[in-house]
Amino acid sequence: MPPELLLPVPEELDPAEVVSLILNYLTAHCILHKKGQLKNGETVLIHAAAGGVGTALLQLGGLLELKMYGTASVTKHPTVREYGGIPIDYKNQDFLEYIRNEVPDGVDAAFDPIGGLNLRRSYKAVKKGGRVISYGFAGDSFGGMKQMAIGVLQMAALNFWPDGKRVTLCATPGEVKKDNAWYRETLTELISMLAARQINPVIGARVPLMEVKRAHQMLEQGNVAGKVVLVCEP
């Protein structure tokens, strides 16, 4: 581990919760502040709102008093509501139609980890001059670097439309590498917020390291709210 990535953590904090900060909450913070530059009271659409990054976005977005719409399966709607979001059943409701009915001019920003057709529809849900932050391409049929390349090309194409909207990629590992000062400052802030219980990472499951296959299956099935954490047994 490079020493510039190491930070002190109070002993009393739950290691599983601290682990959630390193990717999920850093990503959410990057989306809201560094890339999205969200202001208090704005309206946003959060896809996969009951997932690890989604619940982090809900909690950090709540501190900004954002009005938050979040897509999730019905069984996870209580989680979305608990953290201040308005749930949308993406399996039985057209999220774009729902947003257009609720916010005719469009939301200020949309956060999309899915890509493909979903990213294009997220773009349509955003008002003129709004922004779409992409942070993954989970819905694309291709894998690896090809998946990433296609997603980036799609974002570039959307940015050519003359409606003032912008589509931006948030790739947290890349942000950490190129801006270590941001990483250290932001993670230190998040650790302090956790210690003060201003944020409460949602741990959907704690799985022994030897059962890593089961953890991946849980993620693929999408039936866990929050983060799946691998635990090293004594």
Where are these regions (language model features)?
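NAD(P)H dinucleotide-binding glycine-rich loop of Rossmann-like/cofactor-binding domains
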Residues: 1-48
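Glycine-rich helix-loop-beta junction characteristic of Rossmann-like nucleotide cofactor-binding loops
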Residues: 34-38, 101-104, 124
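Local beta-strand N-terminus motif with an aromatic residue
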Residues: 41, 84, 105-108, 199, ...
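N-terminal Rossmann-like NAD(P) cofactor-binding module of classical short-chain dehydrogenase/reductase
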Residues: 45, 108-111, 133
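N-terminal Rossmann NAD(P)H-binding glycine-rich loop of SDR-like oxidoreductase domains
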Residues: 50, 54, 58
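Adenosine-nucleotide cofactor-binding segment
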Residues: 62-121
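Glycine-rich phosphate-binding loop and adjacent beta-alpha segment
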Residues: 117-196, 231-234
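C-terminal capping/lid region of NAD(P)-dependent oxidoreductase domains
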Residues: 191-206, 213-234
